[in-house]
């Protein structure tokens, strides 16, 4: 998922890992694991 802020990653990361947290690196979400 593309992003500008870590908040942009909440929904895509929740879908991907079940965890609504991630970093935004090079405009791409890098999702954390819970």
Swiss-Prot record:
UniProt keywords, alphabetically: Amidation, Calcium-activated potassium channel impairing toxin, Disulfide bond, Ion channel impairing toxin, Neurotoxin, Pharmaceutical, Potassium channel impairing toxin, Secreted, Toxin, Voltage-gated potassium channel impairing toxin
Effect the entry attributes to changing residue 14 to A: Increase in selectivity for Kv1.3/KCNA3 over Kv1.1/KCNA1 (>2000-fold more selective). Very weak decrease in inhibition of Kv1.3/KCNA3 and important decrease in inhibition of Kv1.1/KCNA1
Post-translational modification as stated in the protein's UniProt record: Amidated. The amidated toxin shows 5-fold more affinity for Kv1.3/KCNA3 than the synthetic carboxylated form.
Keyword flag RNA-binding: no
GO CC terms of this entry: extracellular region
Residue numbers marked as site, Important for activity: 21, 25-26, 33
Annotated signal peptide: none
InterPro entries referenced in this protein's UniProt entry, alphabetically: Scorpion_toxin-like_sf, Scorpion_toxinS_K_inh
Disulphide bond pairs: 3-24, 9-29, 13-31, 19-34
Protein name stated in the entry: Potassium channel toxin alpha-KTx 6.3
Protein source organism: Heterometrus spinifer
Classification of source organism: Eukaryota, Metazoa, Ecdysozoa, Arthropoda, Chelicerata
């Amino acid at each position: 998922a593309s992003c500008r802020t870590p908040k942009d990653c909440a929904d895509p990361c929740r879908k991907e890992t079940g965890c609504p947290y991630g970093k935004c690196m090079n405009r791409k979400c890098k999702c954390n694991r819970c």
